From Swiss-Prot:
Entry similarity comment: Belongs to the GHMP kinase family. IspE subfamily.
GO BP terms: isopentenyl diphosphate biosynthetic process, methylerythritol 4-phosphate pathway; terpenoid biosynthetic process
Role summary: Catalyzes the phosphorylation of the position 2 hydroxy group of 4-diphosphocytidyl-2C-methyl-D-erythritol.
Reactions mediated catalytically: 4-CDP-2-C-methyl-D-erythritol + ATP = 4-CDP-2-C-methyl-D-erythritol 2-phosphate + ADP + H(+)
Pfam families for the chain: GHMP_kinases_C, GHMP_kinases_N
Record carries keyword tRNA processing: no
Record gene name: ispE
InterPro entries per record: GHMP_kinase_C_dom (IPR013750), GHMP_kinase_C_sf (IPR036554), GHMP_kinase_N_dom (IPR006204), IspE (IPR004424), Ribosomal_Su5_D2-typ_SF (IPR020568), Ribsml_uS5_D2-typ_fold_subgr (IPR014721)
Lineage: Bacteria, Pseudomonadati, Pseudomonadota, Gammaproteobacteria, Alteromonadales
Species assigned in the record: Shewanella halifaxensis (strain HAW-EB4)
Keywords per UniProt: ATP-binding, Isoprene biosynthesis, Kinase, Nucleotide-binding, Transferase
One Gene Ontology molecular-function label: ATP binding
Enzyme class name: transferase
Stated name of the protein: 4-diphosphocytidyl-2-C-methyl-D-erythritol kinase
Annotated metabolic or biological route of this protein: Isoprenoid biosynthesis; isopentenyl diphosphate biosynthesis via DXP pathway; isopentenyl diphosphate from 1-deoxy-D-xylulose 5-phosphate: step 3/6
Length: 284
């Protein structure tokens, strides 16, 4: 077994550079086309391998039971059960990404847990096998395990690696919770965007089909997006509430961040086509 204590495993945020909803399936899920890109802004997880099969989790968010916390333990347990691993783990989560918001933080934490423990427990699963486990935890988990910017189709499980530009982003976090389930159940959600080839999509204006609905239902999202659009091309990520503006230079994004009203939180981060998680795995 590898060294029992392993530090600094990143769980990066993702952005949906576009999100098109093509149809609603008979099972209630939605057919979609989307482009995922990572940003270099992450949660961090530390792992201590235990010689008995118990699972422990600590977080810097004292007293807060977040979806990401639950998914971390679910991920560890799923790998443990699938591989019949007799080791356990103690995990420390340094939560830096906003919870909810469309940045994929909970799914990313779960993916990092699967990737790290597969290495530390020496369970030997392939990336494909890890993705199959991850998909049972959440539709976005496989893209974080895959570790590369990706075009996704189906319900988000069919991935094709792509290399969009890697600009700087200013990501803003409206102080409102948007329910993904409510967005996808809303009768006013557009569900008829035509399916296009990847080549056509990469050369077309990008949009998020959820954006207008979420902005209508949540004025704080509309207000935040309107403010950011004064400075840069901007969209919502996922089902919100976070929005992002694109900049060529880091300083441009930081200059706009400095003007941000005190009531809105935000951060500047660079787009990354290779996940920081993959770079950490390569160090093992």
């Amino acid at each position: 077994m590898t060294a029992p204590l392993s530090l600094g495993w990143p769980a990066p945020a993702k952005l949906n550079l576009f999100l098109h909803i093509n149809a609603r399936r008979h099972d209630g899920y939605h057919e979609l086309q989307t482009l995922f890109q990572f940003v270099e802004h992450c949660d961090y997880l530390d792992f201590k391998v235990l010689d008995k099969p118990e699972l422990k989790l600590h977080s810097n968010l004292a007293g807060v039971v977040a979806d990401s916390d639950n998914l971390i333990l679910k991920a560890a347990k799923s790998l443990q059960q699938h591989t019949k691993c007799q080791f356990g783990v103690e995990i420390w989560l340094d939560k830096r990404l906003p919870m909810g918001g469309g940045l994929g933080g909970g799914s990313s934490d779960a993916a990092t847990t699967l990737v790290a423990l597969n290495q530390l427990w020496e369970t030997g699963l392939s990336a494909t096998e890890l993705c199959e486990l991850g998909l049972k935890l959440g539709a976005d988990v496989p893209v974080f395990i895959n570790g590369f910017s990706a075009f996704a189709e189906g319900v988000g499980e069919k991935l094709q690696n792509v290399e969009p530009a890697e600009p700087w982003y200013l990501v803003l976090v409206p102080q409102v919770h948007v329910s993904t389930a409510e967005v996808f159940q809303d009768p006013e959600l557009p569900r008829n965007t035509p399916k296009l080839s990847l080549e056509s999509l990469m050369n077309s204006p990008w949009q998020n089909d959820c954006q207008s609905l979420v902005a209508k239902r949540h004025p704080q999202v509309a207000k935040t997006l309107g403010w950011l659009l004064e400075y840069a091309p901007s969209r919502m990520t996922g089902t919100g509430a976070c929005v992002f503006g694109q900049f060529e230079q880091e300083q441009e994004a930081k200059d706009v961040l400095a003007k941000l009203p005190a009531s809105i939180q935000g951060f500047v981060a660079k787009g990354a086509n290779i996940s920081p998680l993959m770079l950490r795995l390569a160090q093992c």
